Amino acid sequence: MLSYKKVLIVGRPNVGKSALFNRILDAKRSITESTYGVTRDLVEEVCKVGSFNFKLIDTGGFTILKDEISKIVVQKVLSSLEKVDLILLVLDVNEILLEDYEIIERLRKYSSKVILVLNKVDTKDKEFLAHKFHNLGFKRYFLVSALHRRGITKLRDFLKVEVGRVNIEEEVNIKVGIIGKPNSGKSTLINYLSGNEISIVSDQPGTTRDFIKTKLTRNGKVFEIIDTAGIRRRARVNEVVEYYSVNRALKVIDIVDIVFLLIDVEEELTSQDKKIAHYVTKKGKGIIIVFSKWDLLEESKGYFETLKGRVKFFFPVLNFAPIFRISVYKKIGLDSLFKEALKVKDQLELKTNTPDLNKMLNLWIKDYHLNISHKIKYITQVSTNPVKFILFANKIKNFPNSYYNYLVNNLRKIGYKNIPILVELREKIRDLK
């Protein structure tokens, strides 16, 4: 795996860390609402400046609050200080608070790699405010406005020289999104896979808000794994931040090859799980149903087979999807899960040529004994990943579902067994472009 130097952004809540993170990246990755404590996880991204790369890490706000999540966030920040090459300490140029002094004291032992970034210097008139920060003892500093992009180019150029490495692109063979309800075990899984606690693990639902990326090699292939905030029913999304997280999770589905739909084995499958599955299949993405926390279950003989039967009965939209059980703590099922993901990816990349398809189509039509007025004329595969076919018929109005399903089931038998198949019906061959 490629190794980049790491730059950690730290500071109390609402000094503009995530806005600065996005500006340095020149992309909108972290959620940046003006809500106290919005970023909770370590959000990592490779930053590209010209032909140089480094890893940029956004952190949760350093706070003196004593609730469980705040304490976990602070501990995560402190445990990261030793591991990084550079620390950007972000302060609000307009004020310095008790929490600022608290983190400054924690950074004293790392002062050689601390860069002071005074944010919210929105106009040139505010630059004079910087003088009150000189006595903090940090030799290197930058004046920026993340909101107005002031000073960002200068800071990016500095980081390029200080920690940048020549850009060598690493091929990603497969992208996997970890999707599911809050507290279904997503963060525990990605922390195990990455070897770092980059996503907060807690028994409070909704502790991951940003999406978390990590790369790993399994079976000789490079996986990019993306963990997301748990998807809730839209009716329950009553915070701006949660709204952004739900939409970001849906956007993650758009960019990955395969989704691991995590379901807590102690909970019943829900209509929300079904909605997620519908969205995934509509997009033509691979999907593997993963029952997590299997170690918590007192399993009776044959229970897993019963569970699989229930999924296929109550969720027929997923009747093609592989179903696995895992336990991160007992290391159950993880190797098999990744092997299956590679098999699904191979199916997504399968392309069957048009002459062979139409030879098989003629056989399928002959074997279909019901007498119907709808006649299939031609079939062609127009894309892979997502796999999509176009069927041309003499008419498509009131096309029988049973006939449609019969054709799809036959397509599955030629190599598309465990993936969604998109099939579009058209009436005229000349419509194909």
Swiss-Prot record:
This entry's Gene Ontology molecular function terms read: GTP binding
- In its UniProt entry, the species of origin is given as Borrelia garinii subsp. bavariensis (strain ATCC BAA-2496 / DSM 23469 / PBi) (Borreliella bavariensis)
Q: Does the keyword Repeat apply?
A: yes
An annotated GO BP: ribosome biogenesis
> Subunit composition?
Associates with the 50S ribosomal subunit.
Q: Name one Pfam family in it.
A: KH_dom-like
Record-annotated membrane-spanning stretches: none
Function, as annotated: GTPase that plays an essential role in the late steps of ribosome biogenesis.
Where the record annotates domain EngA-type G, the positions are 5-167, 174-349
Protein name per the record: GTPase Der
Question: So which residues are the signal peptide here?
Answer: none
| Entry-linked InterPro entries | G_ENGA (IPR031166), GTP-bd (IPR006073), GTPase_Der (IPR016484), KH_dom-like (IPR032859), KH_dom-like_a/b (IPR015946), P-loop_NTPase (IPR027417), Small_GTP-bd (IPR005225)
Family membership noted in the UniProt record: Belongs to the TRAFAC class TrmE-Era-EngA-EngB-Septin-like GTPase superfamily. EngA (Der) GTPase family.
